Amino acid sequence: MNALFKNRAFMLVMASDILQQFAIWIRNMALLYFIMERTNNDPVSVSLLSVMEYAPIFIFSFIGGALADRWNPKRTMVAGDILSVMSIIGIVLLLKLDYWQAIFFATLISAVVGQFSQPSSSRIFKRYVKEEQVANAIAFNQTLQSLFMIFGPVVGSLVYTQLGLFTSLYSLIILFLLSAIALSFLPKWVEQEQVARDSLKNDIKEGWKYVLHTKNLRMITITFTIIGLAVGLTTPLEVFLVIERLGMEKEAVQYLAAADGIGMLIGGIVAAIFASKVNPKKMFVFGMGILAMSFLVEGLSTSFWITSFMRFGTGICLACVNIVVGTLMIQLVSENMVGRVNGTILPLFMGAMLIGTALAGGLKEMTSLVIVFCIAMALILLAIGPVLRMQIKKEDVTNKEELTNSLASK
């Protein structure tokens, strides 16, 4: 881990991530509170805010990954932060003119920009982080995200309630500019080999072919799609767990979110220590088994402490699963395909999650809250099947360049 902290590229990307996480949480909480105040707690407006946040992830990650493979990742990430700054400046000007609906546009722009930045950071990791340190790097990144899941809403709420909307937006400009400055100190990116570029459409097709021709990636894709459906079914119904099963006020849902975040934090730390020592396939199966059990117990439980404990366990397991998948995605995929593979798997996950979210309310009305959570449990158990078929061998990592070349020649 000490060697990782001495890695200049890794530390600069992490510094950028920290600044961006502060900006994202300040933005999320400020926009949520502002929309609720402006619309008198209109659920449709709040839902629209979520759609603006998630729909672009599904739509643009298809092309975002392909373009990230074509573009210089350092410039792409810096440009993403600059575009975020420009969009926020535009929003401030529109709000000054009382066009508050521009808030939705701000969320849309931020979500779109992220689809180009994320695969670019994966390429930076692929180039500058040694293979034996990748698991620790992913685990450290997961730990940071978990910390922000716990403290991000608090920081965002504090900035908005104490300083107001415009100061919140001004702070975003500063944070994104600092992130861009940090990224500008990354080593100069030089393509290690000149790859003949086809059309964007063919680049996207290559990403699909790469995943379909790589058994482990194919199994990960199937698993993640099923997990997305299960997560989509349960996420919108969490507040009903609090109200109907636990008999508490809706505001208590934040305590479950905190338990989840603490679990992810601890899971990230545990994975950072053991990820390189434990068989990733076994960690994957174990994490998903506990996740399935937690869905069942959460649906049946009428005790706040039992539900919180299971949510804590869910956080640990999700952290382990995310770290295993993130590590495999970097180890098994050649550098010039990282963006396209991300742009193949992530949209399927997000699409399945959006389908699950759309079905959740209707399923609950037709059946019951308990049955929906049991369906989610069954889906997670089903998703273990493809993982069991994975065969992670050293040659899968060493021969990935040969696969890229063979696909490119077809």
What do these predicted regions represent?
Residues 11-29, 52-66, 72-87, 102-161, ...:
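Substrate-agnostic recognition of the 12-TM MFS/MFS-like secondary transporter fold
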Residues 123, 127, 165, 169-198, ...:
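Helix-loop junctions on the cytosolic side of multi-pass membrane transporters
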Residues 58-61, 70, 74-76, 80, ...:
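C-terminal transmembrane bundle of multi-pass solute transporters/carriers
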Residues 1-55, 214-260:
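Helix-loop boundary and gating motifs at the non-cytosolic
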Residues 32-38, 92-93, 151-171, 244-245, ...:
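Transmembrane alpha-helix termini and helix-breaking/packing motifs in multi-pass membrane transporters
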Residues 1-10, 189-221, 406-409:
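Juxtamembrane intracellular "pre-TM" segments in multi-pass secondary transporters
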Residues 32, 88-95, 156, 160, ...:
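Structural signal for membrane-spanning alpha-helices in multi-pass inner-membrane proteins
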Residues 93-106, 299-311:
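Helix-loop junctions at membrane interfaces in 12-TM secondary transporters
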